[in-house]
Structures are given as structure tokens and as C-alpha cells.
Amino acid sequence: VRESNREGGCPGDGGAIDNADVTVTIDRSHGSERLAQRVIRCRPGRSGPRRLESSQELLFVESGHGTLQVAGDEHLLEPDMGAYVVSGEEYELENAGPEELVVVVVEAPLELGTAIDPARRTVRYADRPVLRAGADREFRYLVNQDVGCLDLTQFVGLIAPGRAPDHSHIYDEIVYIIEGEGILHLGGQEKVIGPGSAVHLPPLAEHCLENTGKGSMRVLGVFHPSGDPASRAYESE
């Protein structure tokens, strides 16, 4: 489990995201070969440009308001919004202030190409339908094949209080805790998780996110290959 504490600098080869604090939460050094996650906390103003080469980035606005500027177009950013940028594109983040603009970014190789529609580059959580993932869980898709992302799926899920059966997925996933507290059960170990915690779940890893709070736990998930968050490779009785 990694926590999104502040660090300076910007990872990757695409150029600096200046005017911001950047924290790498998950990458190869943490055992994730394909997916990398970082949290960007933008101060008021505009960042420098970042260009993607052979990769794609799925952005999630955790808090704050601003704009995403890509290919001469401006896209408004607000909390609980997903956004999609692909190889060959250059983008900038602008924070109108006065509060921080906090963006959670997952980067992955571009493998199947893209069918991105620039007019649908951003996706509002409030506009997406609620889907079930078991009796006590629900989710909404953000960036997925509906907006032209063929390799990855991004979603926000709600986990009710309590512990569901241990289970596994065929996909490779990074989970980020937006809201709520609980316990991660993974590999025979238990770790406390809360807002800002980031978890890498390799394919077929048996796990459970137990919600120890009184309200729903809200999580951001991004996984490869693209698919259904409700699918299970295994579930205990």
C-alpha cells in the first residue's frame, strides 16, 4: 500500500508538469510492470506541456476545478471527472484557483491503438449509469471503450460497510482510495487503508477491500485489459 504524500518533481519522459507537486504512488519499482500511477497537486496557474509517446494516460479529478488543454481545445475539469490523453498528444493542466487541483493519473502503454473522440475526452461521473458489482457494491464507468480507450478501463466504485468474500480478477489493476477507511486483505496480510492509499492488484491475486467505516468507501480503479469491474476469476464462499 502506498500513500500519496507530497514529493517534488515529475516522472516519465513526456515533459514536466511544473507548478505542481507530483507523487509517484505505483510504478515498476513497486512491482507494477504495466501500470503506473501518480498524484498531481496543481497550484493556481498553468502547467508546462507534457507530451505522450507510445503511452496513454487516464486522468481523474479528485478535487478542485480547472481545464485540460489538448490540441488547442479546452476541457473543463471538475471533481469526479475522468479524462483521456493518448500517444502523440500534448496536454497542459490549468488551475484557476484558489484551491489545489488534485488529479490522479494512470499511465500505460498504448497497445491496441485508440478510437478517441476529442469531443468526448472528458467523462462526468454524474452522467454515467450506476451498475452493480455484487450485492454490496456498485460502480460507474468513466474512461473505457465508450470513449475510445481500448486497452484500459477506469471506474469509480462504492463499497458498502463490511467485508465481502475474498476474490480475484484476471486483470492487472491499480486501486486508489478516494474516501473512506478500511483494511486491505492481500497475500495473507492485512494493511490499513484510507484516503490517498494506492494498491496494486496483480492478475489472479486473491484480495478483499474491507470497509470498516459507517458509510460507503469510494475507490478509483484502473485496470488492463479493458473489461468489466464486476467480473471475477475466483470468489471464496
Model-based region annotation:
Residues 49-81:
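Extended, compositionally biased flexible segments
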Residues 31, 87-112, 203-229:
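Ligand-binding loop in jelly-roll beta-barrel domains
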Residues 19-26, 36-53, 153-169:
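Conserved short histidine dyad/triad with adjacent acidic residue
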Residues 54-67, 170-183, 187:
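Glycine- and acidic-residue-biased ligand/ion/polar-headgroup-sensing regions
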Residues 134-166, 170-173, 178-181:
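Surface-exposed interaction/gating patches
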Residues 72-88, 188-203:
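Short acidic-glycine-tyrosine-enriched beta hairpin
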